[in-house]
């Protein structure tokens, strides 16, 4: 447990030494206040934890933690020449996707669970932790991968059938739309019958 906190601390220190929008803001605050950006970051983390405990904006904070940080490092992984970090973050997004779907269907019950957002935040931090046994790796190796390999053929067949049906439906809709447009253009608007104009001749009254 101590090793994971040490690695997280090293990752945070490396992040604070990089040049990005977060460190630029921290550097400006450090220049004005004289407080080191390391302590500013730790203070922000403490305030975030307090909001999670109190429940104010906890859902938004959890989503930002689970998305913004991994998205940033996923972009860096895409731009890097190596592929090891690509696999790491792809694994995280697979677990994040499954977790989000499960949370959607059980949110009405989990909303009343005490300190749910604190537990969710800790779970997401565990999934993105910079260690080989983080949550995404453990869950993928022991849950997702065995299930996928066991049902891969069935899943591929189902996806193929859905794709074929979707393409067929799209072709039918396109064909019907084109047929309707061609028919309307061929028939054209119906011609209205000519209306007779009133006679301009004035009839003189007859005198008996």
Curated annotation (Swiss-Prot):
One of its GO terms (biological process) is embryonic retina morphogenesis in camera-type eye. The chain crosses the membrane at residues 49-69, 93-113, 115-135. It is a multi-pass membrane protein. It is found in: Endoplasmic reticulum membrane; Cytoplasmic vesicle, Clathrin-coated vesicle membrane. Its main location: endoplasmic reticulum. Keywords: Cytoplasmic vesicle, Developmental protein, Endoplasmic reticulum, Membrane, Transmembrane, Transmembrane helix. Coiled coil: none annotated. Residues 197-208 have a biased composition (Polar residues). Disruption phenotype: Morpholino knockdown causes abnormal retinal lamination in the developing eye. GO terms for cellular component: clathrin-coated vesicle membrane; endoplasmic reticulum membrane. InterPro entries: TB2_DP1_HVA22. Residues 187-208 are annotated as: Disordered. Pfam families: TB2_DP1_HVA22. Required correct function and survival of retinal photoreceptors. Required for retinal development. In rod photoreceptors, facilitates stability and/or trafficking of guanylate cyclases and is required to maintain endoplasmic reticulum and mitochondrial homeostasis. May play a role in clathrin-coated intracellular vesicle trafficking of proteins from the endoplasmic reticulum to the retinal rod plasma membrane. Belongs to the DP1 family. This is Receptor expression-enhancing protein 6.
């Amino acid at each position: 447990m101590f090793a994971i906190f040490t690695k997280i601390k090293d990752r945070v220190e490396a992040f604070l030494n990089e040049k990005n929008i977060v460190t630029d803001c921290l550097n400006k605050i450090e220049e004005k206040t004289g407080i080191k950006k390391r302590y500013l970051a730790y203070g922000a983390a403490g305030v975030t934890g307090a909001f999670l405990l109190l429940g104010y904006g906890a859902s938004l904070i959890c989503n930002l933690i689970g998305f913004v940080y991994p998205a940033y490092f996923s972009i860096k992984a895409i731009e890097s020449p190596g592929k090891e970090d690509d696999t790491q973050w792809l694994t995280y997004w697979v677990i994040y996707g499954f977790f989000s779907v499960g949370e959607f269907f059980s949110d009405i019950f989990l909303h009343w669970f005490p300190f749910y957002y604190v537990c969710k935040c800790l779970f997401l931090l565990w999934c993105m932790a910079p260690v080989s046994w983080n949550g995404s790796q453990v869950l993928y190796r022991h849950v997702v991968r065995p299930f996928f390999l066991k049902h891969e053929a069935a899943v591929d067949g189902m996806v193929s059938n859905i794709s074929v049906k979707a393409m067929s439906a799209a072709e039918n809709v396109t064909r019907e739309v084109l047929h309707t447009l061609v028919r309307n253009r061929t028939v054209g608007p119906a011609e209205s019958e000519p209306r007779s104009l009133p006679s301009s001749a004035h009839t003189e009254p007859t005198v008996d």
